[in-house]
Design a protein with these regions (language model features):
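Interaction interfaces in information-processing and related assembly proteins
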Residues: 1-230, 298-305
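Cys/His-clustered metal-coordination modules, chiefly Zn-binding fingers
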Residues: 198-305
């Protein structure tokens, strides 16, 4: 069964996207060894990124979410592409705070309520990425994404995200949904949608009860006769490789590589997103940089016919 769906109301006025991101957040917790609060914080951001990525028009387009708050967790980053697959990292994954009065994890306290959410959209058809920034509303992630859509994209949006962490720090369940009103929505439709959402249990309550993303859609869009547009599997997926890492190092240039080589000819690069380690011989990289620089660029004069 696919873990992400996109749907549309019968009249085309309301878009829904929902995901069960339990496997994604479990993978993130295993990779980053996060505390309960940081699992919830990073898990919510990854879930939101998966939802946003699935709404891109081209699978090769990307979105990067960067949450920079005043809290002890530091900077959180989540990246996604048009498939909805995600990867992410957090500066201080071991930060833990006391539970809030309602017994919930204090994600806002870990992230910080003062700060900025930056959304970078990289469309392959545009020369430069589009960057949007909004102040954090609460640091709880869902409210911050809702604020981004309202102020940066002027799209009325409802975002709900949830991560339930067990006492042994494993992830019991995680998921979320995005609902957007398209132009032309009537006051009656807005009122109906507000009533539906107010009557819904939390995301984690629904997931623990065995509800699927499609079940969430039926509850949220009750009375709107929603139809599933498409469904897919999304996962935590890092796209790093030895080749890409080498290209990144070569982009530093010969002089910078020589400085690094003089300090230590053996270079290790660790991916922030999946912690894969790549080993390089800087003597070899310096030579590759020289060869790359000396390789003549084909011109009409030296091209053979």
């Amino acid at each position: 069964m696919s873990n992400l769906i996109r749907g549309l109301s019968e009249n085309g006025g309301v878009v829904f996207c929902g995901v069960d991101s339990t496997a994604i957040v479990r993978k993130a917790e295993q990779l980053h060894k996060t505390s309960a609060t940081c699992s919830a914080a990073l898990g919510r951001l990854l879930t939101g990124a998966a939802l946003m990525g699935s709404m891109l028009k081209d699978d090769r387009d990307t979105i990067t979410l960067r949450v920079s708050g005043s809290g002890p967790a530091g900077v959180l980053i989540a990246c996604t592409d048009g498939t909805g697959n995600v990867k992410g990292c957090i500066d201080n994954p071991l930060v833990e705070l006391p539970l809030k009065e309602n017994g919930h994890l204090d994600v806002g306290g870990a992230v910080g309520r003062d700060g900025v959410l930056t959304v970078i959209r990289d469309n392959r058809l545009q020369k430069e990425p589009t960057v949007g920034q909004v102040p954090l509303v609460s640091g709880e992630i869902a409210e911050d994404l809702t604020s981004y859509y309202a102020y940066s994209e002027q799209v009325p949006t409802v975002c709900a995200l949830g991560v339930l962490v067990d006492k042994d720090l494993t992830i019991a369940c995680a998921g979320g949904y995005l609902i957007q009103l398209l132009p032309g929505a009537t006051d009656a439709e807005i009122t109906q949608l507000e009533q539906n959402i107010a009557a819904m249990p939390s995301v984690t309550e629904m997931l623990r009860a065995g509800k699927t993303p499609e079940d969430m859609m039926q509850l949220a869009l009750k009375g709107f006769e929603p139809n599933v547009l498409d469904e897919r599997d999304v996962a935590y997926q890092c796209d790093c490789s030895h080749e890409r890492t080498e290209e990144m190092l070569l982009s530093l240039g010969k002089k910078e590589l020589e400085k690094l080589r003089d300090e230590d000819p053996n270079c290790e690069v660790v991916c922030h997103f999946c912690h894969t380690k790549y080993q390089f011989d800087l003597n070899e990289l310096v030579q590759k940089a020289v060869d790359k620089h000396e390789t003549p660029v084909p011109t009409e004069e030296n091209e053979s016919v």
